[in-house]
Amino acid sequence: MQDKALFSGALDTPFMQVITWARLYHKNQKRYEKIKKSFTFHETCLQSTKGIVAERILKPCVRRKVNGKFRST
């Protein structure tokens, strides 16, 4: 049920674009599940970082620039 609530959002948000990309790019279901779990946790953080780099998605932790330095959130 949580997935349906999460994925029912509009596709034009950066978060949904990233999810769609991850879903298409990673055919491996386990890998996709991992990505999805990290997304549910970092949804608001991902939405706030619009210029997100593709490689960062694959890490469970999103890095943001704070005071000119990259910090894990």
Swiss-Prot record:
It comes from Treponema pallidum (strain Nichols). This is Uncharacterized protein TP_0749.
